[in-house]
C-alpha cells in the first residue's frame, strides 16, 4: 500500500501577501478602516464598526476582496481571519495587517486562516517576529510559513468541525452567563425577604 506523501507549501507559493495601508479616518464614510483594536483576542472583528473612510481613487484598490485573509502582523495576537464581504462589508485594513490574497481554488481562505491560527504556526511566527514593542511579522516571514494543504473535502471538514467547536464554546459561555444571572437574582431575592 502506498502512503500519500505529506507536502507543505510556503504560503507565498499559494497566495500573494501585501501590507495594509495608512489612512486618516474621519467620522463618516462608506468603508471601514480596520485598525489593530478592531480585531478581538478570539480572532473576530469587533461589532459595531463604523464607516470612517470615503472610497475614492486609489483606496478602491485597497478594499478587501472575497477570498482574502486578514492577518494581524503587529502585536502579540498574530491571528488570521477569512474575510467575508457579506458579513463585514467594505473594509480597508491599516498597516497593522497583512492581506493574504488567495486565488488558488484548491485552498479555502478559511483553511489558510485556521492553519495560521494553529499553535505550530503561531510558535513559528512568534519566533520569527521582529522588534519588541510591539513585535511584528514581516511579509517575508509570513510568506515563508509552510502550510500543509489537504484535499478540499478535508479542508471543508476541518472548518466544519472548527466552527462547531467554536459554537459549542460560545453556547457554554452563554449558559454560564445565564446561570450567573439566575444565581444573582435568587440571592438578591433571598436577602429582600
Describe the function of each predicted region.
Residues 25-31, 62-64, 83-95:
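Short, surface-exposed loop/turn microsegments at beta-strand edges and helix-strand junctions
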Residues 73-114:
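A short beta-sheet element
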Amino acid at each position: 500500500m502506498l502512503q500519500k506523501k505529506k507536502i507543505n507549501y510556503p504560503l507565498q507559493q499559494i497566495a500573494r501577501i501585501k501590507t495594509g495601508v495608512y489612512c486618516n479616518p474621519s467620522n463618516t464614510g462608506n468603508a471601514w478602516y480596520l485598525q489593530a483594536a478592531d480585531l478581538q483576542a478570539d480572532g473576530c472583528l469587533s461589532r459595531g464598526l463604523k464607516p470612517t473612510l470615503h472610497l475614492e481613487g486609489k483606496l478602491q484598490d485597497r478594499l478587501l476582496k472575497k477570498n482574502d485573509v486578514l492577518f494581524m502582523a503587529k502585536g502579540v495576537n498574530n491571528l488570521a481571519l477569512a474575510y467575508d464581504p457579506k458579513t463585514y462589508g467594505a473594509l480597508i485594513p491599516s498597516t497593522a495587517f497583512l492581506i493574504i490574497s488567495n486565488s488558488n481554488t484548491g485552498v479555502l481562505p478559511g483553511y489558510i486562516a485556521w492553519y495560521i491560527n494553529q499553535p505550530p504556526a503561531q510558535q513559528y511566527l512568534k519566533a520569527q517576529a521582529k522588534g519588541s514593542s510591539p513585535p511584528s511579522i514581516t511579509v517575508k516571514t509570513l510568506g515563508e510559513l509552510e502550510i500543509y494543504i489537504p484535499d478540499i473535502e478535508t479542508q471543508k471538514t476541518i472548518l466544519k468541525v472548527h466552527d462547531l467547536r467554536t459554537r459549542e464554546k460560545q453556547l457554554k459561555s452563554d449558559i454560564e452567563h445565564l446561570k450567573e444571572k439566575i444565581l444573582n437574582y435568587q440571592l438578591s431575592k433571598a436577602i429582600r425577604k
